[in-house]
Design a protein with these regions (language model features):
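Nucleic-acid nuclease catalytic cores
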Residues: 60, 64-111, 197-248, 252, ...
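Short, structured coil/loop segments at alpha-helix boundaries
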Residues: 41, 70, 122-126, 208
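Residue-level marker for well-ordered alpha-helical positions
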Residues: 18, 75-76, 134, 154, ...
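Active-site metal-binding core of divalent-cation-utilizing nuclease and nuclease-like domains
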Residues: 3-58, 98-109, 125, 137, ...
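A short, charged helix-loop
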Residues: 112-120
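A short mid-domain helix/strand-loop element embedded in enzyme catalytic domains
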Residues: 125-133
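Long, low-complexity, intrinsically disordered segments
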Residues: 258-263
Length: 263
């Protein structure tokens, strides 16, 4: 509050940060200023975190200077920091308003496991599918829930890569007349795609449709959606849309032939 009163609202966040560093130092309060740390899983860097402060290894304040209100993305950002630093308490502070606005947050860790799922018939390489699911399952079992989508994408990449399969990050493809369009899925062994979502309720139709778009333009037969929610984790196998339609047409034809022969 003293920093807000001394500086006034609405300036660059860095000014408030520097003033807080000076105030904490003068008061003899132990703190880390913008500590940058890597999240490493099985020797592979999955993400990098840099909170504004870690104070007395007890709580994490994050400084903002906003025109509007705190958003869910701000909360997710702080929860990621708390999970990584293994701290429960954090504080969002907004220097953008006439009065100092702050919100105290408490992080609670959750663990999860995937329900055992057999690859469906359209999966052309069941062994690779099983390897992917097992690797990612071990990762979520070890790490627990709470990270954002970008962090989980890095963790999934690290988990799969650590057990052998080749992983291509952000593959590109030609879409209609547009060259080099980047897809957010991971491509595994040039065989399938993996799409990662997080902090939503569950895998939904949009998630499946997005992966199908990636499969279509990357010319891959199948893929897996992994979702890491607030309290649960789940997965779904997805087929290339044209392959799926072809299979459905074949089943209808076969069904029609059976009906004719029975008459």
């Amino acid at each position: 509050m003293k920093v807000h009163s001394a500086v006034g609202p609405g300036l660059d966040e860095e000014i408030y940060h520097q003033e807080l560093v000076a105030a904490l130092t003068a008061a003899g309060i132990s703190h880390l200023s913008k500590p940058r740390r890597d999240l490493v899983y099985r020797g592979i860097v999955a993400d990098t975190f840099e909170p504004d402060f870690v104070i007395e290894n007890h709580f994490i304040p994050e400084l903002k200077c906003l025109l509007g209100e705190f958003t869910p993305e701000h909360l997710v950002q702080l929860f990621c920091y708390c999970k990584f630093w293994r701290l429960r308490t954090s504080l969002l502070v907004d220097f953008g308003k006439q009065s100092l606005i702050w919100k105290r947050l408490l992080y609670r860790s959750h663990i999860a496991n995937f329900t055992q799922t057999e690859p469906p018939e359209f999966v052309s390489n069941p062994s690779l599918a099983a390897t992917i699911v097992q690797a990612v399952g071990e990762c979520v079992n070890e790490i627990g829930l709470g990270y954002r989508q970008s962090t989980w994408k890095g963790l999934v990449r690290a988990a799969i890569q650590s057990v052998g399969p080749k992983v291509e990050l952000n593959p590109a493809a030609k879409v209609l007349t547009h060259q080099g369009i980047t897809m957010s899925s991971l491509v595994i062994e040039n065989t399938c795609a993996v799409y990662v979502t997080a902090i939503t309720d569950r895998i939904n139709a949009t998630d499946r449709a997005i992966l199908q778009t990636h499969l279509r333009w990357l010319n891959l037969d199948w893929g897996i959606v992994f979702h890491f929610g607030k309290t649960t984790a789940d997965l779904a196998f997805v087929q290339h849309p044209k392959k799926r339609n072809s299979s459905a047409d074949l089943q209808q034809i076969q069904g029609g032939q059976q009906t004719i022969s029975s008459e």
